[in-house]
Regions:
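Glycine-rich active-site loop/strand segments that organize a redox cofactor
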Residues: 49-95
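A glycine-rich dinucleotide-binding beta-alpha-beta segment and adjacent secondary-structure elements
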Residues: 127, 293-372
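Feature captures the FAD/FMN-dependent oxidoreductase FAD-binding
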Residues: 76-154, 292
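Glycine-rich FAD pyrophosphate-binding loop
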Residues: 23-47
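N-terminal Rossmann-like FAD-binding beta1-loop-alpha1 element of flavoenzymes
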Residues: 4-31, 390-395
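Glycine-rich loop(s) and the adjacent beta-strand/alpha-helix scaffold that form part
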Residues: 154-200
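An anion/pyrophosphate-binding glycine-rich loop and adjacent beta-alpha core
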Residues: 36-38, 43-44, 52-59, 92, ...
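Short hydrophobic core segments
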Residues: 7-9, 131, 150-166, 177-178, ...
Length: 400
């Protein structure tokens, strides 16, 4: 049997970072993962460049049944702290839209940074390792990992959510929480494209690949202003992914296809200058022609010239283009979702240490916890912050 101070389950962003920090603080750490590579989701993120944090991280950008839970960890290890770490390793990065920070080169650099940090902490990393059983004993926990028995004082669960099962996602962390009597909140896919009902989808097939800036609004009033992308399955793009976290099955979403236009004024002006111009050609100055043609087949806009367009028709047109109501059929699910909403109930955990109130020595960090960030680096920051908070608690316990 092998003995460790800390075993961390899951070599994703949160697990790697926590293991490294705990190791550097003097803990003897074992990090295990069932995959053949560490940081698989990191490598896939941000189009291979890893959107590693966001300049504008704040608690309001996170969803949780307890919105206050994330505040402590985010305040104690901030985006600036991780940026400092990137700079220390000489990893070049740049800011894209809305405060999103990406590596100039490759997400591999972030994984290499984390592995180097683990090396500095003398962390033992075992990949292709399945945790077959976990038992509580007087001194901590007894784990069966493949054919190896491991004893540990502290157990950190950083096994992630259900999103992207192709990268090894599983319900392991939720089942472990339930094994020890912790409440797990219902989960669903988030930061995920919408699918559409067949009649509307058939009309929109010609738009696959078309992207437009828009403001999308959920029934609860939450809105996002970014681009939307029409796909062969439905709707995607940053604005849609963001809104999916706030959408409930059966609800409508409102899409403003012309968020920057005073459409009434534009049409009135064009009517004076080009009275015989078709409405379709006029709107093609503002929107992709394929989208205008599609909206016409959906009877969202009349087939008339500008001088034929009467006031009621114009009012209806403005409403259709700036408050287009669409009812998604559902989402693409965990297969393409970037994150999972729900998970281990934060009421079960200390917001300062991530330790379970009922089970001393058991910690949950990262996506397995009911804390879900917006698109744009927020979920990576939660991984760094929750991992750091947990590591500080592990280090303090080691000193005792």
């Amino acid at each position: 049997m092998e003995q460790f101070d800390v075993v961390v389950i899951g070599a994703g962003a949160a697990g790697l970072f926590c293991a490294a920090q705990a190791g550097q603080a003097g803990c003897r750490v074992l990090l295990v993962d069932n995959g053949k590579k560490a940081g698989r989701k990191i490598l896939m993120s941000g189009g291979g460049r890893c959107n590693f944090t966001n300049m504008f991280v704040e608690p309001a950008a996170y969803l949780s049944q307890n919105p206050h839970f994330c505040k402590s960890a985010l305040a104690r290890y901030t985006q600036w702290d991780f940026i400092d770490l990137m700079n220390r390793y000489g990893i070049a990065w740049h800011e894209k839209t809305l405060g999103q920070l990406f590596c100039d080169d490759s997400a591999q650099q972030v994984v290499e940074l984390l592995l180097k940090e683990c090396e500095l902490g003398q962390v033992t990393i075992r990949l292709r390792s399945d945790v077959l059983s976990v038992e509580k004993n007087e001194s901590g926990f007894l784990l069966q990992i493949n054919d190896l028995k491991v004893s540990t004082n502290s157990l950190v669960v950083a096994s992630g959510g259900l999103s992207m099962p192709g990268l090894g996602a599983s319900p392991f962390g939720y089942k472990l929480a339930e094994q020890f009597g912790l409440k797990v909140l219902p989960t669903r896919a988030a930061l995920v494209p919408f699918t559409l009902h067949k009649p509307l989808l058939e009309h929109l097939q010609t738009l696959s690949g078309v992207s437009v800036p828009a403001v999308v609004t959920a029934e609860n009033g939450v809105s996002f202003r970014e681009s939307i992308l029409f796909t062969h399955r439905g709707l995607s793009g940053p604005a849609i992914l963001q809104l999916s976290s706030y959408w409930q099955a059966g609800e409508y979403v409102s899409i403003n296809l012309l968020p920057d236009a005073d459409l009434d004024a534009f049409l009135n002006n064009e009517r004076q200058v080009h009275p015989n111009q078709t409405l379709k050609n006029t709107l093609a100055q503002l929107l992709p022609k394929r989208l205008v043609e599609c909206l016409q087949t959906l009877e969202q806009l009349p087939d008339v010239t500008l001088k034929q367009l009467n006031a009621p028709q114009q009012a209806a047109l403005v409403a259709n283009l700036q408050q287009w109501r669409v009812q998604p059929n559902g989402t693409e699910g965990y297969r393409t979702a970037e994150v999972t909403i729900g998970g281990v109930d934060t009421q079960e955990l200390s917001s300062k240490t991530m330790e379970a109130h009922k089970v001393p020595g058991l910690y949950f960090i990262g996506e397995v916890v009911d804390v879900t960030g917006w698109l744009g680096g927020y979920n990576f920051q939660w991984a760094w912050s929750s991992g750091w908070a947990c590591a500080q608690a592990l280090a303090a316990k080691q000193v005792q």
